Amino acid sequence: MKNLTKSIIASVLVAVPAFGLACDYPERPTLPDGSTASKEQMIAAQSSVKAFLAAVDEYLDCIEQEEKDAIAALPEIDESDEDAVTSREAEIKRRDDLLAKRFDAANEEKFLFGEKWNQQVRAYNDRKAEQKP
């Protein structure tokens, strides 16, 4: 029975990552060079930046829901089977740790992308300030 339970859990764990195809990480927009960009280019880029950041948040919501669904889809186990319980708990922890890493990476990219955008905005504003008589 223990081997059957482990086999079922293993087969579900192999199948579950296929569900991950529904959440696509958004493509990062290209930022204009603030030292040469027009006002229109900067305004368009600002819209793209906001859309990208919102899309990353949607991606994070999506992968979080996928993980909840994947954990809920794990097969029922005999709670008296300590090996099965331990195996299931280890799998849930592994998935939680992986989700946390994905969240951290996405939030780090949001931060760094925001910093790059702010650098271009500063370059644009500095150029405009220099052009004033």
Regions found by a protein language model. Name each.
Residues 1-11:
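Bacterial N-terminal signal peptides that target proteins for export
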Residues 6, 27, 60, 81-84, ...:
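Low-complexity, compositionally biased segments
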Residues 9-12, 63-65:
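A ubiquitous, low-specificity "background" feature that marks scattered single residues
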Residues 11-20:
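Hydrophobic h-region of N-terminal signal peptides that target proteins for export
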Residues 19-68:
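Immediate post-signal-peptide N-terminus of mature secreted/exported proteins
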Residues 74-133:
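Compact alpha-helical subdomains of small soluble proteins
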